[in-house]
């Protein structure tokens, strides 16, 4: 994961935490640096292709997010990359070219509930599609492979 994306996700996870603690109306206004663009992202998305609780196909999900002013999404299906794979194989170069879709997963640990995991695109770890690791082992695996993680449902 490039340092730009790593910084983006760490900041996004912090902002999510801050939103929960302070409430959306009390959040600080984000500061943009020269040459950068603020993007509106949905950081926790389940798709019909990848999660049992996902009701909307990923292409319909993207269209709805665009309609609501979003620039991107993090696909975080439960213990599966299938929603992201569907986008990458069937949609990526055909439509929604300016919309950013990133790969994540909502991992079900045995002792700490659901954890969002974001790995570098080049890392392929099948173990993340199996559920039930203890959270400390998950943290070690993710960090050793250059990923980041955080609580899926912080409150």
Language model features: what each stretch is:
Residues 1-2:
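N-terminal amphipathic/hydrophobic targeting modules at extreme N-termini
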Residues 5-9, 14:
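Aromatic (phenylalanine/tyrosine) cluster motif
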Residues 150-155:
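Active-site-proximal loop/helix segments of hydrolase catalytic cores
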Residues 17, 27, 32-140, 144:
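A metal-dependent hydrolase metal-coordination microenvironment
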Residues 147:
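Short loop->beta-strand "edge-of-pocket" segments that line small-molecule binding or catalytic clefts
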């Amino acid at each position: 994961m490039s340092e730009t994306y790593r910084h983006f996700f760490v900041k996004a996870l912090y902002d999510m935490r801050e939103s929960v603690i302070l409430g959306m109306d009390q959040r600080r206004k984000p500061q943009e640096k020269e040459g950068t663009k603020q993007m509106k992202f949905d950081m926790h998305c389940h798709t019909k292709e990848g999660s049992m609780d996902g009701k909307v196909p990923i292409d319909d999900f993207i269209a709805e997010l665009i309609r609501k002013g979003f620039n991107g999404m993090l696909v975080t299906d439960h213990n599966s990359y299938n929603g992201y794979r569907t986008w990458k194989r069937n949609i990526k170069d055909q439509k929604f070219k300016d919309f950013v879709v990133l790969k994540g997963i909502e991992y079900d640990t045995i002792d700490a509930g659901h954890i969002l995991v974001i790995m570098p695109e080049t890392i392929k770890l099948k173990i993340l599609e199996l559920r039930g690791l203890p959270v400390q082992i998950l943290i070690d695996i993710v960090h050793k492979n250059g990923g980041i993680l955080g609580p899926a449902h912080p409150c």
